[in-house]
Every structure is written in C-alpha cells, then in structure tokens.
Amino acid sequence: MIPKIYENLRHIVTQLLSIFKVAESETPAIGRPKKITDADALTFALYQHASTRATKKSVYEDFKENLACSYKTFVVSVNRVSMLTLRLLAIIMRFNKQTSHLVKYTDATDIPVCLKKNMDEHKTMRSMAGLGRSTKGWFYGLKMTLTRDHDGRMLALKFTKPGENDRDIFREINKDIYGIIVADAGYVSKQLEQDMYLEHKRWILIRPFKTMKRLMTKWQEQLYKGRFKIEFDFRDLKLFHGLVTSLPRSVNGYLANYLHALLSFIVA
C-alpha cells in the first residue's frame, strides 16, 4: 500500500517540474536505463524528510515490494537528483524575490557533521567542514546562512565553513535583495550598513550590542522582534526535516541531505 503522504508529494513534484519547466535528465542512449526515474527519486527523498523516516534504509523498506532495484541503486538514485533539487531551489528563490515582503531577515545556523569529539577521525566532510562556535558551544561542521522574508519565503542561501566572515556572506547573498533587511548583532558593522544601503531601495537594520548606546524607535523594536521567525525556521529544519545528519558516507550524500531537507521544508 502506497502511503498517502507519498502520493501527495508525487503530485507536488509533478506540479513543480511542470510549472517551472525543469526537465529530468535524459536516459542514456547506451547502457542500462534508470531503475528509478528522477521524479520518483525526488519524491522518495522528500518522503524521507517530510515523514518520520530518519534514514534512506527505512524509506527503502517501506517501498521495497514496489521497487525493482537493490538498496545501493536506491541510494545512488536519491543522491543523483540532488542537482535537480538544487535547480528547483534556485528557481523558487528567484521567483520568491519578485513577490517578497518588504521586510526580510538574515541569520546563520550551525550544521554539525559529527560530534566534536570525533572531528579528528571524521574524513568524509573534512574538505568542507571546520571547527566553529555558536550560542550552543563548539561544533564541527558547516554554517548555513539564510535570508527569508516576513511571510516565510526563502530568498537566499549559502553553505560555508564556520570561520567565514558573516558580513562578507551577508553582502554576497543579499546583493540582489531589496527592502528592509533585519539582522542580529553578529553583523554589526557601520561599513556593512553603508555598503548595502541603496536610497529608496534597500536599508539594513542591525540590532546593536547591549553595550552600544543607540536609541531605538518603536517600529524598529517590532522589526527586531520578528527575528524569531527565522529562528523557528532553523528549528523546524533540524527537528522535523532532518537537516542535520552524520549518517552519509560521501560528500554527495551530505549535500543531497541538506538540499532535500530544504526543499521538503518549502513544499511539504
């Protein structure tokens, strides 16, 4: 029996591919045809992140009777469509920028790839991960910087090592975003505010440190209070869409997990 959530996700995937005119990769002229189509593989990936399934193995067990392939082929197929997922995310964010709310929020969160005590033995993401520190303490992994608008539309995204300069990342991902962009005290910089300011188009509102004696108007306070929404997005991504994992055994597996979790968060 096919779960209802899978059928709903299959319909969503079909609609996305049709609306945005994203073509699946063609079947090779020579060699064996695909055991799992790109649309089905993407649906399986979203099913994992939108349901309670923590691993690809559990998803495979759910559909083993309907799949004419091995578990290895299933994993390869799901990881293969990460490029299709990346294209969909890019198209969705580009579309969201055209219809976005005036107020935007930018923030970063930690994405551990393993426990800190295991960092010396971790090899899979060694070229991309690094040691960083967040409000929760030290971690070994990546940093994800995200911009969303007041209504929850995802507008920009970037993965970096934890040691990358937050202000440089802010400039890069928000260079084509306009309106009022609100950020926390980690982005405090007079130069950043001057660089990003565009008269009648873009204004940066950065919350000052508690030790900084700066007056704040009532409407600025209300904008600052809205930052909890992007914090909730990070929480939902990690708790309910499986953004953080240490299970993949390849770089492609890690990146596919992050991209599929983000698309699941947007559409599921």
List PLM regions with ranges.
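Short alpha-helical elements
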Residues: 1-268
